[in-house]
Amino acid sequence: QDYEKKKKVPAVLDIHGGPRTVYGEVFFHEMQVWVSRGYAVMFTNIPGSDGRGDEFADLRGKYGTIDYDALMAFTDAVLAKYKKIDPDRLCETGGSYGGFMTNWIITHTDRFCCAASQRSIANWVSMAFISDIGPMFCPDQCDAQSLYGDESTRRMWERSPLRYAENCKTPTLFIHSDEDYRCPLPEGMQMMQALCANNVETRLVIFHGENHDLSRSGKPLNRIGRLKEITGWFDRHTGI
């Protein structure tokens, strides 16, 4: 959209996956699409990201704590610096770990007017038994000793967004692929059902024949469809 100096703009907080990946100075077409429609785009490398050493990147047992705090502080800092951003029209999205973080945010604050959670983690306990890396990855990331036992289950459940879903008030779109074995479809379904039970506006979009890499190497029409779903959800809730 044409820039208008006095007009406030909505913004998208985009959270990378991993968590041990990193945003760099590269062209990212999704951000360009949103900017072209009149959004500001916010992104940063929070604790858990690569690029600042192993201690900074080690998020085991701390999911939803220092990373969440860093994202909220970052959002506050952006809003303080860029007064053109409308704090009442903030959107958030992310995939994989970014999807986990999207789920965590919507269950811990209602500062975002809408969210799009992609290929996400909702429940570490269920994911431990259905993900292709679940038996190893989930206990390790939740600082649990094994798949089994009350203490391990407690630790995984404590770090699960689904546990806190009754707090969610944010209209949320869930996107999953039915051949995603990393963050399987039931993770998004659980969150969607929890929001429905609490009368929160939600939508689940399933891409058939796609996997965890839909956004990167999916069929072209499905990649376009995915971005249209996300952007349309944002447009609807920000009034663009």
Name each model feature, range by range.
Residues 43-240:
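Active-site-proximal cap/loop segments of hydrolase catalytic domains
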Residues 1-7, 160-162:
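Short beta-strand-to-loop junctions in surface cap/lid or active-site-entrance loops
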Residues 25-44:
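Short amphipathic alpha-helix adjacent to the substrate-entry channel of hydrolases
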Residues 6, 34, 165-168:
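A short, aliphatic-rich alpha-helical micro-motif
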Residues 6-17:
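Short beta-strand element of the alpha/beta-hydrolase
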